[in-house]
Regions:
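Class I (Rossmann-like) S-adenosyl-L-methionine-dependent methyltransferase catalytic domain
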Residues: 1-46, 50, 61-97, 101-111, ...
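Nucleotide donor/acceptor-binding cores
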Residues: 52, 118
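Conserved beta-strand/loop positions that form the S-adenosyl-L-methionine
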Residues: 57
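Class I S-adenosylmethionine-dependent transferase superfamily signal
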Residues: 68, 141-142
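A conserved beta-strand element that flanks and buttresses the S-adenosyl-L-methionine
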Residues: 121
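Short catalytic micro-motifs in class I SAM-dependent methyltransferases
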Residues: 124-125
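Short glycine-rich, flexible loops that bind phosphorylated cofactors or substrates
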Residues: 128-129, 160
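A short, conserved alpha-helix within the catalytic core of class I
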Residues: 129-141
Length: 228
């Protein structure tokens, strides 16, 4: 699985964390208030507990991951970008809070002890997974990561709202289903619900507050198991 983040962050200063992962508005890093909104939403939704072992898929440079270190027992972040993982290791890695360089599609089938994890996070990255990878990730999380009871997938682009993002008056239909496009694959909430259910998950759609900078065209998802 290729990624726009393999080379793009090389243009950024090592400590320019939010620009490195394009958490920006008009090229400028989003405000601390916006980051706090993201962090609070993830915390509230994942319901992290002191004994949780958190897996962060496509974790980027760890700038967001670090906010959850004190909320869980252990942490593993996985990303395909050598540049971003180097930043994560340099600035954020700690004992029991580790980052590894690996393609998520490869990692999800090679993790030697998937049952150790209890919660999963994937923020702002899922739309860049090719369709087969997206389906494989969700299916493997359900079948092999058997102790994971909640998965938060954040900042998904809503197909029904793409014109709120593309305001240039041109048609962008040709790129809405391309994983390697600027935003990745756009899915309507109903499309994502169908995908999640096909992979064994119960899916809940969430919306950020109106003041969230991307709330007019993105949504979040909570995946949970049906415990018999």
């Amino acid at each position: 699985m290729d990624s726009i983040y393999k080379k793009f962050p090389s243009n950024m200063a090592p400590g320019d964390f939010w620009r490195q992962i394009k958490r920006t508005v008009n090229g400028e890093p989003v405000s601390d208030e916006q980051i706090s909104m993201i962090v609070s939403t993830i915390r509230d939704t994942l319901q992290l507990a002191p004994d949780d072992q958190l897996l962060d898929l496509a974790c980027g440079n760890g700038a967001l991951s670090q906010y959850f270190f004190d909320d869980c027992h252990s942490f593993l972040g996985v990303d395909i970008s050598e540049i971003l993982i180097d930043v994560a290791k340099r600035y954020f890695e700690q004992p029991n809070r580790k980052f590894v360089l690996k393609d998520v599609g490869e990692y999800i089938v090679s993790e030697p002890c998937p049952q150790r994890f209890t919660k999963v996070l994937c923020y702002g990255s899922f739309s860049y997974f090719p369709e087969l990878t997206a389906r494989q990730v969700l299916t493997r999380l359900n079948r092999e990561f058997v102790n994971v009871d909640r998965v938060f997938i954040g900042n998904l682009p809503d197909l029904e709202l793409h014109e709120a993002f593309y305001t240039d008056g041109k048609s962008h239909d040709h790129e809405l289903k391309m994983a390697d496009s600027l935003i990745g694959i756009w899915r309507s909430p109903s499309e994502f619900e169908a995908l999640a259910e096909d992979c064994g998950w119960r899916c809940s759609i969430q919306r950020m507050p109106r003041e969230f900078y991307a709330g007019h065209y993105r949504y979040d998802v909570l995946l949970a198991r049906d415990r018999a």
